[in-house]
Amino acid sequence: NLSGFGGPVHDSWFTERTELARKNQLIMRKLGMQPVLQGYSGMVPVDITDKDPSAQVIKQGTWCSFQRPSMLKTDSETFDKYAQLFYKVQKEVYGDVSDYYATDPFHEGGNTGGMSPTVIAEKVLANMMEADENGIWIIQSWQGNPSTALLQGLDAARDHALVLDLYAEKTPHWNETDPGSYGGAEGGGEFLNTPWVYCMLNNFGGRLGLHGHIENFVNGVAQAAAQADHMAGIGITPEASVNNPVLYDLFFETIWSDDGENLS
């Protein structure tokens, strides 16, 4: 959402964070998990043209008064070059640890610069799969993202995308009925029939409190499991964890029940 704040950061900080990531990924792999790596959708520093005058960029404006990074035009040769370089270097740094890559070109704002979101999605996914033929694009369903137009760009390999219905316990998008939103359709569009995950967000900014939308997710998970054809599972997406254990314990119990939990 933002290109930077404060700094500069010492080189040792990057080295330490990289080693920490490697250790975390090793533990995940031992537990049979695949970490989600960063995907590439064209984000570049706002001064990229000072170093590469050939770069065709779309200015992305600001987010909460902070400068957003610029975005390469995805229909340019520069985008393909940068995307393949990104995935190549990331693999050199972390190794072949995962097939899952998360990126949201228009998270909480952004600017298409007149480009078609459908074309943007096609190019992002094509470059991801060129780097990793088993690649899965992780997309957050949050606010206006992903648009129906962006979801249409997944048609060539829809099974290589996974949408996280980020705040499903409060505002689910998987059953959206507006054809203009989230690939909605009468009866629920399931993101244009893209594999998706029912997620509980619950926590914002690490705030403490014993609260949550318990009835919503108890009934919501059961409803989705019974009615959805493309639900891949459930997950949590909090901004902080190690809090409110009752809520999380109950949430993960819901997937084992056909009718939801009895809250009485």
Where are the model-predicted features located?
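Catalytic-core regions of glycoside hydrolase
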Residues: N1-S264
